[in-house]
């Protein structure tokens, strides 16, 4: 409960199922005033990586031109630490087609800088910890669907989701 959640059912014991929900007092007022809760977290399935990257690049362009977000209000998270750099390089090409400036935190800029005015921030999951943005996109989240140490993969996805200030 110290981090804004309450247990609805189940047990927090290892290997047990549990259902958590956000406490109403732990959610900023603007969440209810300005946002439709059903639109806050959206999931979408893509046939291939380039289709995903192009869709997200278009959405980011819309966020900047129509939704009144500054580029540095937007964070793109790559859950796979191993592939984040190569995935970012491919994703950045899609952003460039829409004249969107970006950086991969700690790789394409100084290590201690996470946000640059006029540029969207992209990050591997561990670099994103402790940093938040009003708008967060999680790309290639399918890497958290199955595999060895599934609980760590799910925690990775949860960490990515909680990088949004709306959370």
Predicted regions and their residues:
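The feature marks helicase ATPase cores and/or their adjacent C-terminal helical subdomains
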Residues: 1-167
């Amino acid at each position: 409960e110290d981090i804004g959640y309450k247990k609805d059912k189940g047990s927090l014991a290892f290997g047990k199922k549990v259902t958590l929900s956000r406490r109403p007092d732990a959610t900023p007022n603007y969440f209810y005033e300005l946002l439709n809760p059903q639109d806050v977290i959206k999931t979408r399935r893509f046939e291939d990586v380039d289709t995903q990257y192009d869709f997200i690049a278009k959405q980011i362009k819309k966020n900047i031109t129509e939704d009144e977000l500054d580029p540095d209000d937007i964070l793109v998270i790559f859950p796979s630490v191993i592939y984040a750099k190569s995935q970012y390089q491919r994703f950045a090409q899609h952003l460039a087609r829409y004249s969107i400036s970006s950086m991969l935190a700690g790789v394409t800029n100084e290590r201690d800088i996470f946000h640059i005015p006029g540029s969207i921030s992209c990050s591997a999951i561990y670099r994103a910890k402790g940093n938040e943005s009003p708008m967060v996109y999680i790309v290639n989240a399918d890497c958290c669907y199955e595999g060895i140490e599934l609980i760590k993969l799910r925690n990775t996805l949860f960490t990515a989701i909680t990088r949004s200030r709306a959370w």
